[in-house]
């Protein structure tokens, strides 16, 4: 796994450099075309149709702005994929830990993805158990898991009329705290559930999923001595339960 991480880091770096140039230059190209569009339109209306890039301008005048927009979106998508690859390669096993309040971590995660939540659903509910015991861990790493689970829930919804619920609670019997992320999304096929945390396994390949988000999350949870459990029914929704042990009491 360490060798795979090194390979992935190298590939991510090689992809990131040329994509960085695309992201840098695309806004400039879009502005250039906007400035040139007035001249092109004047010629089109005064002299009739002409070719642009070997194709009729009457066609390209509508298609070029769409092409530029698609290129910008594709470059942003590559950037997101590279960031996931780098997260996978990093696999930070830092032993720097501290007492962590799960409620605060979840609230911070929700703030980070607020725009995605608002775009995905009109019905977002939270229920925080009061006075949760502290857990021992790395708050930033646990927040990364919470962000991933919430974004997955957002992406699973067929429309904004479906609900997402976030709940924290304390399991006294197991002396552990739990985060439950429930959605009314499309659900997960039973045969896919055992593979959800496998590296590079994804049911969202066509929309740019890398299959690394849950793999990285599972590694972080394992570092903290916790567990990730999935309960899903196709067409009904999914419940993901993150369980983490509480701090040892002295």
Where are these regions (language model features)?
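Conserved catalytic submotifs in the C-terminal HATPase_c
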Residues: 107, 120-133, 169
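Short alpha-helical Gxxx[C/S/T] motif in the catalytic ATP-binding
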Residues: 213-217
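Detector for a conserved hydrophobic position within an alpha-helical segment of the HATPase_c
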Residues: 220-222
């Amino acid at each position: 796994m360490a060798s795979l991480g090194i390979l992935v880091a190298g590939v991510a770096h090689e992809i990131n450099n040329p994509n960085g140039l695309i992201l840098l230059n695309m806004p400039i190209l879009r502005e250039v075309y906007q400035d040139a569009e007035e001249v092109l339109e004047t010629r089109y209306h005064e002299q009739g149709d002409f070719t642009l890039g070997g194709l009729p301008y009457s066609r390209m005048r509508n298609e070029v702005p769409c092409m530029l927009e698609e290129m910008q979106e594709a470059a942003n998508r590559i950037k997101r994929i590279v960031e996931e690859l780098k997260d996978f390669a990093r696999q930070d096993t830092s032993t720097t830990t501290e007492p962590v309040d799960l409620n605060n971590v979840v609230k911070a995660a929700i703030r980070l993805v607020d725009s995605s939540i608002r775009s995905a659903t009109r019905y977002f509910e939270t229920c925080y158990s009061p006075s949760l015991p502290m857990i021992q861990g790395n708050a930033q790493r646990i927040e990364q898991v919470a962000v991933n689970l919430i974004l997955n829930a957002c992406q699973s919804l067929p429309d904004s009329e479906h609900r997402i619920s976030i709940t924290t609670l304390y399991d006294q019997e197991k002396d552990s705290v739990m985060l439950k992320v429930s959605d009314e999304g499309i659900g997960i096929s039973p045969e896919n559930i055992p593979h959800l945390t496998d590296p590079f396994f994804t049911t969202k390949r066509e929309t740019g999923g890398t299959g690394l988000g849950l793999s990285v999350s599972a590694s972080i949870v394992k570092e903290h001595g916790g567990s990730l459990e999935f309960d899903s029914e196709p067409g009904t929704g999914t419940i993901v339960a993150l369980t983490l042990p509480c701090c040892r009491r002295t």
